[in-house]
Amino acid sequence: MASRSLGGLSGIRGGGGGGGKKSLSSRNAAVERRNLITVCRFSVKTLIDRSCFETIDDSSPEFNNFAAILEQILSHRLKGQVTWFGYESPRSFWDYIRVACRKVSQNCICSIENMENVSSSRAKGRAWIRVALMEKHLSEYISTALRDFKTTRRFYEDGAIVLGEEANMLAGMLLGLNAIDFSFCLKGEGLDGSFPAVIDYTPYLKYIQSSDSISSDEEELRTLGSSGSESSTPENVGPPFLMDENSWFNKCKRVKQKYQLTLEQKGYLEELLRLRENQLSESVSQNKILLQRIEDSDLAHKLEKEQLEYIIVELQDQLTVLKNNDLRSRQELTAHLTNQWPSPGALDVNAVALDTLLYRKHNKQWYEKSYQSLDQLSAEVSLSQTSLDPGQSQEGDGKQDTLNIMSEGKEDTPSLLGLCGSLTSVASYKSLTSLKSNDYLASPTTEMTSPGLTPS
């Protein structure tokens, strides 16, 4: 039991130690991120102040320090590149910028990739910082890269500055650099990527003594002065008055420093406000232009819709008129054909056709006669024509001889039925059909010799 309890206590201690290490590492990472962001903000302010008096170039210590700080921020907890053997090789922040900033319009990525005097990734990253500052698009590049969270997550580990809340602060503080005109030489020694960048913290380290510590120092001096002499003479009263004067001077100096710092912050915020106002005015103007375009397009679409509807209505009217005209034409054509070809009862007495044969058949004049061949039928028709019209007997004889010659060698088949009879009326065709059904064959020569070819 004792061994078990000791083991449990040791396990609890071990777990507490692991949790303490984890909290300590997270605290160190947070302090590191905060230090880099704070130093970057100071560096931006010093660059803005220096730009009021001189041009910022590669020889400016403020710019060199800013470039080193930005390089450290973009390289913070950057993942290494895994090789084929499973090892991680160091990687530069340029590999991340090259992928994440390709969506920026009119970017300089391809230009930096094609530079002849720059070969290493670190040197290309430093050249990109200088080109982006000269183009005044550094803040836009950083904002676009941070918005691509998937790519950022792929290149950086947990706890990196670009993955935390400090990333938004970084993109905001870099906006102030758009008001500075930079001038860099992309062939200088500053692009040498053989050594890492080192941050100089000394311009930003100043010891400021608090008012409580100053008062405590004065009390100590008074105590020491009073313990050195028991008599209170005017000579012994002098040092406290001098210390009071020095303390007021120190307080005035501190107030002046705070005022200068506030004035610098005010200038930075005013510049940032001007940039935001310009961006807002541009956005408003673009919004107005887009709204006007939308209204114009809506109006054009409405007009086009009305025109199409009018065209549809007009086409429907035309289609209705054409249908009516077509129906009227059909009716007129039917009436014309009906009036032009008379009925069988109104035919002339001299017109001889198959209707006459049908009439004689019904009167049992030819009831006992049957024609066995086409020649017999044509002869009988010619005899009947001669008996009806004696004046045309001679002419009919000549035509009959011609038809007999033409009919020689032809087969008595139903295919010749279409050539029989007169087409003067529909009743002739119906009479032909009735003759066929009663096994009667009409001679095709009757039509040629019949005077009923033409309508009366």
Curated annotation (Swiss-Prot):
Domain of life: Eukaryota
Species whose genome carries this gene: Macaca fascicularis
Keyword terms, alphabetized: Coiled coil, Methylation, Phosphoprotein
Residues in RUN domain copies: 57-189
Quaternary context: Interacts with RAP2A.
Coiled coil: 300-325
PTM annotation (Omega-N-methylarginine): residues: 13
Protein name as catalogued: RUN domain-containing protein 3B
